[in-house]
Amino acid sequence: MSSRTSDSVTSHDRLANAIRFLAIDAVEAANSGHPGLPMGAADIATVLFTKVLKYDPSRPFWPDRDRFVLSAGHGSMLLYSVLHLAGYEKVTIDEIKRFRQLGSLTPGHPENFVTEGIETTTGPLGQGIATAVGMAMAERLLAARFGSDVVDHYTYALASDGDLMEGISQEAADLAGHLKLSKLIVMWDDNKISIDGPTSISGSTNQLARFAASGWATAAVDGHDPEAILAALEAAKASDRPTLIACRTTIGFGSPKKAGSEKVHGSPLGAEEIVATRAALGWEAPAFVVPEDALNGWRAAGAAGRAAREAWEARFAARPAEERAEFERRVAGTLPAALEGAIVAVKEKAVKDGGAVATRKSSEMVLDFITPAVPEMVGGSADLTGSNNTKAKGAKSVTPDDFSGSFIHYGVREHGMAAAMNGMALHKGLIPFSGGFMVFSDYCRPAIRLAALMGERVIHVLTHDSIGLGEDGPTHQPVEHLAALRAIPNLLVMRPCDTVETAECWQIALQSTDRPSALILSRQNLPLLRTDATAVNRSAEGAYEILAASGPAQASLFATGSEVSLAVEAAKLLEAQGVPTRVVSISSFELFLERPAAERAKVIGDAPAKVAVEAAIRMGWDAIVGSNAAFVGMTSFGASAPAKELYAHFGITAQQVAARALDQLRQA
């Protein structure tokens, strides 16, 4: 492995050392952070950003730029240093000095919604690799639609040993290898150090063999040899497969006492060691000062991308006006005008057809109407296509050799699927959605949480949403999952009660450009309760009266999804006993709680008896109906039996709801 001292400094070294010392100084000033990776991977980043990557700091969101994902998000100062050095205007030296401080553009881990030039938020290891897979998929999908003269770029990721230890890396590697994502290149910072010590204490996997077995091209280079790094990257660009490049590096490169040790991973070097490191690498500039030669070299590299961007703009301008407008619309994320008509049409069909339909089937019906109207939608499923009903009529499957389709077979890779959808949404130009069993949303949770944090439009169709799925039993019956999903900030959770509400919830999900959505759908058939087929979206209110009382309400029943029809039955029982009863359908806690307090109070009403019913745990309901309301639902795991027997066994019946309301009236 190369070893460079102050006596053998090259121009490359000066550029790489600028990264190292900005990272060292920022971590020291913050008294917090991870200097080891930026010091060790500086040579990789320098080659990539000065010799290979296609980008223009003056246009951070240029659609045909190459994407770079720092999967090892703890090494954020590597990326912040590069952005500052390359000329991203907002990442000033003052922001570098404010590393990890409240309100800075340089938070502890990269956040794409905070800092221009950051393609995705990373930090939870493994997420970045799988997100990069989604970005590479988006590039192929859009190129198939608009041509390679408009869409032709690479996705690069820098991953750590920890990234490759995470299970999601295998899901991502399998999917990328199968789809032959040749424009995906992952650089592995192979420093053989983990927080606890050498990686050998916890693993001995041959990572290159693992990725090769998944269909990847692989290479191993000295991560401190710029010529070897460049050659490997050029070979990767020419490959017909995704590529993993193992870059053997020394963590904390240049530190006389801490290089190669876990001690440099997540702690400041300390003043004495910084002085020694400056001497070892021949860096005489004081803290946060980049010598003119190094800064000029970096700024020239950043400015070099302008020509590629302008050439792309010229090619794009030569395309027909209608095609340009469609591409720009999709990248901007605006919806076509045809969506509203499609939603009304599916409502009209539902009302005309009537009958009981599982909301998973309702969702399929909606997709048949809206996917032709919104061609940027790209669906998929985790090997449950026929159960989730996420493949619209006429949808063509994506294959390794043909990305003109709009449906992706993700296989049993829920976590990788969710993260890949994040990457597709971040890329822009597509609206990803996919299906899975609701109970397995636990497998998706880290990626769903990141989508919510980033505010990305990603749609999760989660079916088989309760004990109503029946015989498969408690391993597959969600009980706590609604509460768990509702606990994620900025995630829109919607549980429609029939086909009309399902159509409305799909419309809301598509219109929610700044947050992900989860559509919670039933396996069992549900009666049509809504008979209006207008453009008015009642579900957007979050909660509304779906059945009025015969007089001043003495009881108010609140329900979601499959339990709304049960509440309607209970209301009829109560009305038969002379108790005027109303029913409120709550399509979404989040939408309801966003309404003004006075509006919420009006919907909840002042009936002396209030009962909420949902085939799930109570957690979260008190914020809607108050702690004094009765609740009919689950307090344990489910069981294996037909759905109707399970509802009776667990006491989730119209009779029980009515009884609880009468109990409350007697106590009033």
From Swiss-Prot:
User: Looking at the Swiss-Prot or TrEMBL record, what is one Pfam family this protein matches?
Assistant: Transket_pyr
Instruction: Locate the active site.
Output: E414 (proton donor)
Instruction: Quote the cellular component terms of the Gene Ontology held in the record.
Output: cytosol
Query: Which residues are noted in the entry as thiamine diphosphate-binding?
Result: H74, G123, P124, L125, G162, N191, H265, F440
Q: Which InterPro entries match?
A: THDP-binding, Transketo_C/PFOR_II, Transketolase-like_C_2, Transketolase-like_Pyr-bd, Transketolase_bac-like, Transketolase_BS, Transketolase_CS, Transketolase_fam
Q: Which GO terms describe its molecular function?
A: metal ion binding; transketolase activity
Q: In which pathway does it act?
A: Carbohydrate biosynthesis; Calvin cycle
Q: Membrane spanning segments where? A: none
Among SMART domains, the record links this protein to: Transket_pyr (SM00861)
Q: How does it assemble?
A: Homodimer.
Q: Where, by residue number, does Mg(2+) bind?
A: D161, N191, I193
Q: What does this protein do?
A: Catalyzes the transfer of a two-carbon ketol group from a ketose donor to an aldose acceptor, via a covalent intermediate with the cofactor thiamine pyrophosphate.
Q: Which UniProt keywords apply?
A: Calcium, Calvin cycle, Magnesium, Metal-binding, Thiamine pyrophosphate, Transferase
Site (described: Important for catalytic activity): H34, H265
The record's comment on protein family reads: Belongs to the transketolase family.
On the tree of life, the source organism's domain of life is Bacteria
State the name under which the record lists this protein.
Transketolase 1
